[in-house]
C-alpha cells in the first residue's frame, strides 16, 4: 500500500476548503469560538480541521470511505490484520481491549501501576 496516500486528511481538507458553515460540534465552530491566543499559537487551520463526522467525511462507527482507507493503511503500516480508530484517547481502547479479552469468570492479572482505564474495563461489564 502507498503510505504516502492520506485519504482522511484529504477528505478533511476537502471539507474545510469547501468553506463549510459550522453548525455541528465541536462548539468552537471552526475557530470562531476560540480565544485568539489559541488560534495564534496553534495556527488558524487546526481548529477548522477539528470536525465531527459528516456524510462527506465518513462514519467512524461504519467506515466505508476515507476513514476505512486510512484504517487499512494504518493496519498495513503496523503489520496488523486490522486497525480501528477510536475516540476518547487510549482510555476507550484500553476499556474495549479488557472487555473483549476476558470472558465472564476469567481472571486477569493487572499490574498495580496500570492505567485506571484498565480497571474500568474490568468494572464496566461487571
Stretch-by-stretch model annotation:
Residues 124-125:
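Short, structured coil segments at secondary-structure junctions
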Residues 44-92:
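Conserved N-terminal alpha-helix of the aminotransferase class I/II PLP-enzyme fold
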Residues 82-107, 116-121:
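Conserved beta-loop-alpha segment that forms the PLP phosphate-binding cup at the N-terminus of a helix
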Amino acid at each position: 500500500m502507498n503510505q504516502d496516500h492520506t485519504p482522511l486528511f484529504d477528505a478533511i481538507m476537502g471539507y474545510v476548503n469547501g468553506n463549510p458553515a459550522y453548525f455541528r460540534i465541536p462548539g468552537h465552530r471552526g475557530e470562531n469560538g476560540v480565544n485568539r491566543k489559541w488560534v495564534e499559537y496553534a495556527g488558524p487551520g487546526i481548529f477548522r480541521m477539528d470536525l465531527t463526522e459528516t456524510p462527506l467525511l465518513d462514519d467512524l462507527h461504519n467506515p466505508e470511505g476515507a476513514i476505512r482507507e486510512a484504517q487499512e493503511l494504518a493496519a498495513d503500516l503496523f503489520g496488523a490484520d486490522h486497525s480501528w480508530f477510536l475516540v476518547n484517547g487510549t482510555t476507550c481502547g484500553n476499556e474495549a481491549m479488557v472487555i473483549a479479552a476476558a470472558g465472564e469468570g476469567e481472571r486477569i492479572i493487572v499490574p498495580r501501576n496500570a492505567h485506571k482505564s484498565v480497571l474500568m474495563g474490568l468494572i464496566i461489564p461487571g
